[in-house]
Regions:
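Hydrophobic residues within well-ordered alpha-helices
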Residues: 13, 35-36, 85, 122-123, ...
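Extracytoplasmic small-molecule ligand-binding "clamshell" domains
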Residues: 1-46, 187
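Alpha-to-beta junction loops
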Residues: 18-20, 36-45, 88-89, 124-136, ...
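Short helix-initiation/N-cap motifs at beta->coil->alpha
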Residues: 22-33, 77, 94-96, 110-124, ...
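Ligand-binding cleft/hinge of the Venus flytrap
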Residues: 1, 10-19, 95-115, 141-146
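Flexible hinge/capping segments at coil-to-helix
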Residues: 60, 73-89
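Periplasmic-binding protein-like
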Residues: 65-72, 134, 138, 142-182, ...
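Extended ligand-binding regions for polar small-molecule ligands
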Residues: 7-16, 76, 94-96, 161-201
Length: 204
């Protein structure tokens, strides 16, 4: 069973639309091709609605303003934010803005398919830091990751906002998903799910 804020939100959207959601797990790079070929109907995977991606898919209204944070081991005193990543080995998930941010900071970047690989490498010392969605970092810390790891420095904002994606061929689906999202925000479901996963209230 897959879990996460995105999954809970997707299921709640399905409920509002009166349809059952079936979750398929795919590598991040495979998501847009799968959507365009009709293999899946919607992407709910913390995807930044970037201008490049907007050429290929239709995005809903953003449901999350996320950023990217630097995470290091607790005993690390040399890395206190993005400015200290130059010349370091830094892990980040393939296809995400984290890779770009780490590269821009002058790091040697190791790319992972799954965030779990990043946590493992960080704990075993094969990378110095991980650049990851702030939301993922917050959740991981809340679930006990803060025993060994810490978030350092300020987060860098993800400009476009995080949104669900649907095929450009399905404008009616986009409309329904947007309406369901608006309803979930209005009836308090969204805030409840947000608090459940991140331990904080959503920023207005």
């Amino acid at each position: 069973k897959y879990i996460g804020f995105d999954i809970d939100l997707a299921n709640a959207i399905g409920e509002k639309m009166g349809t059952k959601v079936e979750v398929k797990s795919l590598g991040f790079d495979a998501l847009i091709p799968a959507l365009r070929s009709g293999q899946i109907d919607m992407i709910a995977s913390g995807m930044d609605a970037t201008p490049e991606r907007q050429k290929q898919v239709s995005f809903t209204e953003p449901y999350f303003q996320d950023g990217y944070s630097v995470v290091v081991r607790k005993d690390n005193t040399n890395i206190n934010g993005f400015d200290d990543l130059k010349g370091r080995t830094v892990g980040s998930q393939v296809g995400t803005k984290g890779v770009d941010l780490a590269t821009e900071a002058g790091a040697t970047v190791k790319q992972y398919d799954a965030n779990s690989q990043g946590w493992m490498e960080l704990q075993s010392g094969t990378c110095d830091a991980v650049v990851i969605n702030t939301s993922v970092a917050l959740y991981y810390m809340k679930e006990g990751g803060d025993k060994d790891l810490k978030i350092v420095g300020d987060a860098k904002k993800a400009d476009a906002g995080i949104a669900m994606a649907v095929s450009k061929d399905k404008p009616e689906l986009l409309e329904k998903v947007n309406k369901a999202l608006a309803d979930l925000k209005a009836d308090g479901t969204y805030a409840k799910l947000y608090k459940k996963w991140f331990g904080v209230d959503p920023k207005a």
